[in-house]
Amino acid sequence: GKYQFGKSALRTVGIYDYQEFLRNAEWQDKAFEALIARNKWELRKEIQKYSGRIINGVEITESGLVAAAHLGGAGSVKKYLRSNGRNGFKDGFGTSLSSYIRKFSNYDISHIEADANAKVNLE
């Protein structure tokens, strides 16, 4: 697919047919936006508190934090921030939260509302 999602993440946004998801670019885009909305909600306090700060030489931004949550989960991002970057997650390929925070720091995701229960509308 266009983005990397675990099956459990897809289920949280209402997608249960993984094969159809892989074939359907529209579902992939909708799932991506729904997961951004959920991560923005989950990280809303951290976004407000940490945006603009520098941790490990990287400026903290909303889009960077949301991308890092896509990599390692919102809980890992919270631990990273609370530890001032000392408690860092890496995925199975060695990709770190801080690398995602840097790489995705300047994206405008303001058009996506924070939503604790965001789901994909499949109609």
Predicted regions and their residues:
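Non-catalytic cell-wall polysaccharide-engagement segments
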Residues: 3-30, 34-123
